[in-house]
């Protein structure tokens, strides 16, 4: 059994199918119908519980190759868990996977009702426990739990040292990931790792960019020096967890990179940090965008792209003073992409690599390659 307590006073008890223990975090909902392993292992969900709108989970099991990272969300909530999986690439059940990664699994709850609660109240803090089942004690645990905006989440998911990414994209012929081939690499880029998804790095390398992964706290002077010596051709600012406004030290370094006119691409958290670094602070959405079915309009082509998204924060409208808005979300008209006027920088809020989700925005990586050619 697992007991849940939400900050709005809601107390629930349900079945456990994951790890044992007690976890507190922010509760968000995800509307993806597949790809739960990639969602669970996305570093951007660090410190969060994910409730899936898809009522069934577990039918394809899990494997040792599709993880986005070594890190995981705090817990998973689903209407029904299926222990009997069927997939040629599966190595173990989802339950075994969650237990190995220390992730709580909750099933047998009315997820539709929970999602309506989040839609009405916004994201809520929650504590879940397979050990403590007293409502008052759970309330006390939650009261003392740090808010996600005050937690040093990025430092817990970033690489501790400079590394080279060794994998490229998935090969549907072999049903495995291609090894990175140095011969296909045309340029080297620095990846500022705030919690980068593996498939973003795969896609960068698939378009001919060798990815050198740097810690989140890397000094701008080090990257500027590498750029001036032509050791790197540009910089990618990755996705990651938490409130972007909490990363003040990193924002200060990014300001220097912008002033150095280094070509850059930002995705998700990276997109937000580029905005903040230029004096345009982000704001928090009521319940965020999480899922692989969000329509986004490309304002240049007028095409509507179905995108994968995972964020709770958004850049402000007045960023139009220094940037051309390139994409908008058709659910709420929030900004999804910009091209800066004052520097060779493009950034998007959604995830062009998807994983899970459609590949309709994959061209963003090729646009970055074209941007690098001009410098």
Swiss-Prot record:
Pfam families of this UniProt entry?
CPSase_sm_chain, GATase
Q: Where is this region: CPSase?
A: 1-184
Q: Name one GO biological process term.
A: L-arginine biosynthetic process
Q: Does the keyword Electron transport apply?
A: no
The active site consists of 268 (nucleophile), 351, 353
The pathway it acts in is: Amino-acid biosynthesis; L-arginine biosynthesis; carbamoyl phosphate from bicarbonate: step 1/1; Pyrimidine metabolism; UMP biosynthesis via de novo pathway; (S)-dihydroorotate from bicarbonate: step 1/3
Q: What does this protein do?
A: Small subunit of the glutamine-dependent carbamoyl phosphate synthetase (CPSase). CPSase catalyzes the formation of carbamoyl phosphate from the ammonia moiety of glutamine, carbonate, and phosphate donated by ATP, constituting the first step of 2 biosynthetic pathways, one leading to arginine and/or urea and the other to pyrimidine nucleotides. The small subunit (glutamine amidotransferase) binds and cleaves glutamine to supply the large subunit with the substrate ammonia.
Q: This protein is called what?
A: Carbamoyl phosphate synthase small chain
- Organism equals Helicobacter pylori (strain ATCC 700392 / 26695)
């Amino acid at each position: 059994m697992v007991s849940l307590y939400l900050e709005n006073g809601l107390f629930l008890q349900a079945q456990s199918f994951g790890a044992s223990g007690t976890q507190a975090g922010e509760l968000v909902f995800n509307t993806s119908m597949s790809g739960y392993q990639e969602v669970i292992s996305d570093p951007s969900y660090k410190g969060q519980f994910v409730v899936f709108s898809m009522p069934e989970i577990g039918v394809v099991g899990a494997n040792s190759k599709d993880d986005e990272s070594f890190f995981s969300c705090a817990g998973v909530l689903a209407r029904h868990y299926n222990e009997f999986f069927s997939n040629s690439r599966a190595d173990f059940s989802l339950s075994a996977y969650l237990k190995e990664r220390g992730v709580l699994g909750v099933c047998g709850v009315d997820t539709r009702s929970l999602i309506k609660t989040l839609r009405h109240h916004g994201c809520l803090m929650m504590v879940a426990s397979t050990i403590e089942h007293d409502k008052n004690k759970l309330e006390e645990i939650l009261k003392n739990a740090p808010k996600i905006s005050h937690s040093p989440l990025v430092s817990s998911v970033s690489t501790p040292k400079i590394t080279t990414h060794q994998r490229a994209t998935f090969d549907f012929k072999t049903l495995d990931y291609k090894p990175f081939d140095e011969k296909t690499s045309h340029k080297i880029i620095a990846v500022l790792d705030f919690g980068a998804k593996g498939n973003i790095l795969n896609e960068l390398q698939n378009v001919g960019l060798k990815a050198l992964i740097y810690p989140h706290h890397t000094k701008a002077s080090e990257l500027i020096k590498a750029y001036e010596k032509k050791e790197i051709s540009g910089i990618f600012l990755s996705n990651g967890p938490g409130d972007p406004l909490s990363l003040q030290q990193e924002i200060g370094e990014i300001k220097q990179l912008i002033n150095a006119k280094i070509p850059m691409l930002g995705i998700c958290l990276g997109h937000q940090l580029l905005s903040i670094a230029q004096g345009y602070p982000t704001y928090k959405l009521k319940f965020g965008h999480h899922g692989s079915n969000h329509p986004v309009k490309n304002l240049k082509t007028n095409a509507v792209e179905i995108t994968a998204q995972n964020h709770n924060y958004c850049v402000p409208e007045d960023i139009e003073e220094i940037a051309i808005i390139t994409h908008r979300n058709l659910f709420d008209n929030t900004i999804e992409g910009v091209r800066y006027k004052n520097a060779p920088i493009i950034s998007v809020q959604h995830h062009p690599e998807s994983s899970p989700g459609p590949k309709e925005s994959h061209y963003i990586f090729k646009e970055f390659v074209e941007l690098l050619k001009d410098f």
